[in-house]
């Protein structure tokens, strides 16, 4: 039997579903002040984990469709106000280097998960700063030791979810997927920020996969290489749909290895954000019993159009930037693009 719960902050509301036979999924997103109310009929697990010895339940190379992600079950959730959220942030170390306005003025939600087959325990953490309607999310994965002496991780998502549609719109179909566009940036040392917009149907041709009963295997992935995290691509992109009046903005907050991807499932599109992976960066993390791993943070917002999404991103970055006197009254602006240092 499906159950639901809602997390409300001053700016953003999130709705989640779960069940004895279903993983936790985000099924609602709302920003009442902006008239945003989105529903996600296609339930994507909030956490996807690939580990040695446990692969995908659908043969593919996606960050999603992992067996562990499908098997993780709801084990509880906790809501923290601004004061408690700051105490937790100080304790868990995720924000230990962050001295910002957001750290003292954010609400926090922790969702606990458990996979009985592998003994993996996980906590997915959501944070929203007052006045910045954008959600920061990361996950902590632990080896409980109840099943295996070791668990070797090969990829762990910071965020995964479907595209969604307005609450008052018709359900999504393979045809409506073709109305989405992806805006992303290519980078080079002397040519940063080359933004281009591509209709998703150009990346994912119509295949009538619903006749097979299986989701398509393909994905559009963007990956950092080497130690230059933005040497070729940006860890930031926008998904927009003019017909639905929706626009996602999402980013991976990491100056090391990262990967983001978008793709088409039969019911709807999906996006997934992560740090390093075994496939892309030869990354692995072995967890002994009691060990844990914390993903890089990612963040996302949904607005009515691209301009609105960028406004939310700007408010978010201003809330999370380091506290400094120059934030209130900048004295010097020097745009060197790292080329003159």
Protein language model annotation of sequence segments:
Residues 11, 285-303:
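Short Pro-Gly-centered flexible turn/kink motifs
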């Amino acid at each position: 039997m499906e159950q639901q719960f809602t997390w409300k902050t001053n700016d953003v509301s999130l709705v989640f579903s779960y069940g004895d036979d279903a993983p936790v999924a985000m099924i609602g997103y709302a920003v009442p002040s902006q008239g945003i109310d989105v529903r996600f009929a296609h339930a994507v697990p909030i956490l996807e984990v690939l580990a040695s010895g446990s692969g995908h339940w659908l043969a593919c190379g996606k960050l999603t469709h992992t067996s562990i992600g499908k098997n993780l079950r709801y084990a509880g959730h906790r809501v923290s106000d601004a004061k408690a959220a700051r105490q937790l942030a100080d304790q868990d170390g995720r924000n230990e280097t962050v001295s910002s306005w957001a750290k003292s003025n954010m609400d926090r939600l922790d969702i606990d998960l458990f996979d009985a087959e592998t003994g993996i325990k996980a906590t997915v953490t959501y944070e929203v700063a007052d006045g910045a309607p954008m959600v920061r999310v990361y996950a902590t994965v632990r080896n409980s030791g109840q099943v295996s002496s070791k668990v070797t991780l090969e990829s762990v998502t910071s965020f995964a979810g479907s595209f969604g549609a307005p609450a008052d719109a018709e359900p999504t179909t393979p045809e409506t997927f073709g109305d989405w566009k992806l805006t992303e940036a290519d980078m080079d040392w002397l040519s940063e920020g080359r933004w281009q917009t591509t209709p998703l149907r150009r990346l994912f041709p119509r295949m009538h996969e619903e006749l097979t009963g299986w989701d398509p295997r393909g994905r559009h992935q963007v990956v950092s290489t080497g130690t230059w995290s933005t040497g070729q691509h940006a860890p930031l992109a926008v998904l927009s749909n003019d017909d639905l009046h929706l626009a996602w903005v999402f980013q991976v907050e990491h100056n090391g290895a990262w990967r983001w991807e978008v793709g088409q499932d039969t019911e709807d599109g999906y996006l997934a954000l992560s740090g390093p992976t075994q496939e892309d960066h030869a990354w692995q993390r072995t967890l002994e019993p009691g060990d844990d791993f914390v993903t890089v943070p990612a963040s996302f917002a949904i607005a009515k159009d691209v301009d609105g999404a960028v406004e939310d991103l700007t408010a978010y970055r201003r809330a999370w930037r380091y506290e400094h006197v120059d934030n209130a009254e900048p004295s010097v602006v020097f745009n060197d693009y790292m080329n003159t240092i």
